[in-house]
Amino acid sequence: MERCLILVKPDGVERNLIGEVISRFERKGLAIKALKMMRVTREQAEDHYSVHRLKPFFDDLVSYLTSGPIVAMIVEGNNAIASSRMLAGATDGSKAAPGTIRGDFSLDIERNIVHASDSLESYEHEYKIFFNENEIMD
């Protein structure tokens, strides 16, 4: 079984889309193994977006992720990463297919509702930013 980190970003929380996002992952057959609402620190956001550190939009990403509460969750299932990425849709919501979370709800490329780990390596780095091992259920 594979796991994937999902974040409902500040715009998703602010727009009351938490339940909708969670239910889409559950309907896809993915089990929730960890779930919490939290405020992201600047240090956590910088670590999460570290692959973008040298890009001009890095500071905007960090500011956005720390602008309000998020919901962090870990889902598990067969091909959890690929399934989660398909559910999320293209990063740019204007290019995301209808029926995907971003296609249905995204406001722009930054305020795009959700994050989903894009690889097993990303998941292994990312989940440790948001969860301690004792917060993850077997």
UniProtKB/Swiss-Prot annotation:
Binding site for ATP: 9, 57, 85, 91, 102, 112
Compartment list: Cytoplasm
Reaction(s) catalysed by this chain's protein: a 2'-deoxyribonucleoside 5'-diphosphate + ATP = a 2'-deoxyribonucleoside 5'-triphosphate + ADP; a ribonucleoside 5'-diphosphate + ATP = a ribonucleoside 5'-triphosphate + ADP
Biological process, per Gene Ontology: CTP biosynthetic process; GTP biosynthetic process; UTP biosynthetic process
Metal-binding keyword on record: yes
The protein's enzyme class: transferase
EC numbers: 2.7.4.6
Cofactor: Mg(2+)
InterPro entries: NDK-like_dom (IPR034907), NDK-like_dom_sf (IPR036850), Nucleoside_diP_kinase (IPR001564), Nucleoside_diP_kinase_AS (IPR023005)
Enzyme active site: 115 (pros-phosphohistidine intermediate)
Domain of life where this protein originates: Archaea
A GO term from the CC aspect: cytoplasm
Keyword terms of this UniProt record: ATP-binding, Cytoplasm, Kinase, Magnesium, Metal-binding, Nucleotide metabolism, Nucleotide-binding, Phosphoprotein, Transferase
One annotated GO molecular function: nucleoside diphosphate kinase activity
Claim: ATP-binding is one of the keywords in the record: yes
UniProt similarity note: Belongs to the NDK family.
Function noted in UniProt: Major role in the synthesis of nucleoside triphosphates other than ATP. The ATP gamma phosphate is transferred to the NDP beta phosphate via a ping-pong mechanism, using a phosphorylated active-site intermediate.
Protein name: Nucleoside diphosphate kinase
Species for this entry: Picrophilus torridus (strain ATCC 700027 / DSM 9790 / JCM 10055 / NBRC 100828 / KAW 2/3)
